[in-house]
Amino acid sequence: MEVAEIRQKIVENKEKLTSFRRSLDLDRLEEEIALLENHMTEPDFWNDNIAAQKTSQELNELKGKYDTFHNMQELSDETELLLEMLDEDDSLKEELEENLMQLDKIMGAYEMTLLLSEPYDHNNAILEIHPGSGGTEAQDWGDLLLRMYTRFGNANGFKVEVLDYQAGDEAGIKSVTLSFEGPNAYGLLKSEMGVHRLVRISPFDSAKRRHTSFASVEVMPELDNTIEVEVRDDDIKMDTFRSGGAGGQNVNKVSTGVRLTHIPTGIVVSSTVDRTQYGNRDRAMKMLQAKLYQLEQEKKAQEVDALKGDKKEITWGSQIRSYVFTPYTMVKDHRTNFELAQVDKVMDGEINGFIDAYLKWRIED
């Protein structure tokens, strides 16, 4: 690395540290740490063991952020000092480059912890795809999205499982529900929630005309045992049906598929992946709890948005991302303006750039 490159890298690192400091609000962070430490010294702190463990975990996370920031600051200062000494001692160049590499690695990991710091970002995720109107063309678009997300999940180390699959009449899907199991699944996939628009020459149109199709994607965190969502048995209607794989493969001779309807809200969920009715009911119940929790969070968000004003609704006319196959190739996120011309790579699951851009946009917004 040339000295000019090293100087530029040091300037960029200082700018990043300034951004980290601003987003962290160190003064507030110090106050929060002090409050939690004082709380933990109270005589009755451990009377509620679950609450105490939660507080202890929160304190460790805050201290981790605080200590890591100061470690980065010290490493950055040391790097600057080495640069000043480089004119007198060329042998310091190797140590300087090692410091820069170490700082880059720490900053990259630290940036991810800041981007994924919202509640439930670390949870597993449930993702649903619902094609819009448009028949076979729209249902095929839903199937392409299913393939994209499955490949993304597999490439990034997630365990991907189909919870429910409703095949299209001629091709594609009517709906599909997937689970993603692994660290930060919800935090990463929440960027995909919204309407996805496709523009292409339809393979189902003999006249080879250009078609526009839509599909909506819903993403929910899979709730763990620390979050309670009350669902009364009287509020649930359960139907059973024969389940099978995509395209009707392996159709069961007994009714193992389960469909749950939450009567007060009208929410419907179903699971067909398990070989037993009991297993599918358990999976469907988890999906229902996640949907009810999301519904409650959306209500709270709407109340806040009503106070803020200027809330843009997610409708078929306000897609979050467009995938253009013709007359040119381009995938563009309309929230962040991040775009890629390599449509094939995106459809093969390479959506990390869109996710990173969204997470940074959320922090800046």
Curated annotation (Swiss-Prot):
Has UniProt tagged this entry with the keyword Cytoplasm?
A: yes
- GO CC terms on record? cytoplasm
Main localization category: cytoplasm
UniProt modified residues of type N5-methylglutamine: 249
Job of this protein = Peptide chain release factor 2 directs the termination of translation in response to the peptide chain termination codons UGA and UAA.
PANTHER family xref list: CLASS I PEPTIDE CHAIN RELEASE FACTOR, PEPTIDE CHAIN RELEASE FACTOR 2
Could you state what the record's PTM comment says about this protein?
A: Methylated by PrmC. Methylation increases the termination efficiency of RF2.
Whose protein is this, by species?
Streptococcus pyogenes serotype M5 (strain Manfredo)
What the entry lists under InterPro entries is as follows:
PCRF (IPR005139), Pep_chain_release_fac_I (IPR000352), Pep_chain_release_fac_I_sf (IPR045853), PrfB (IPR004374)
An MF annotation (GO) of this entry? translation release factor activity, codon specific
Which key words are in the record?
Cytoplasm, Methylation, Protein biosynthesis
Task: Please report which protein family the annotation says this sequence is part of.
Answer: Belongs to the prokaryotic/mitochondrial release factor family.
Q: Where in the cell is it found?
A: Cytoplasm
Spell out the Pfam families in the cross-references.
Answer: PCRF, RF-1
Q: Which domain of life is it from?
A: Bacteria
Its recorded name reads: Peptide chain release factor 2
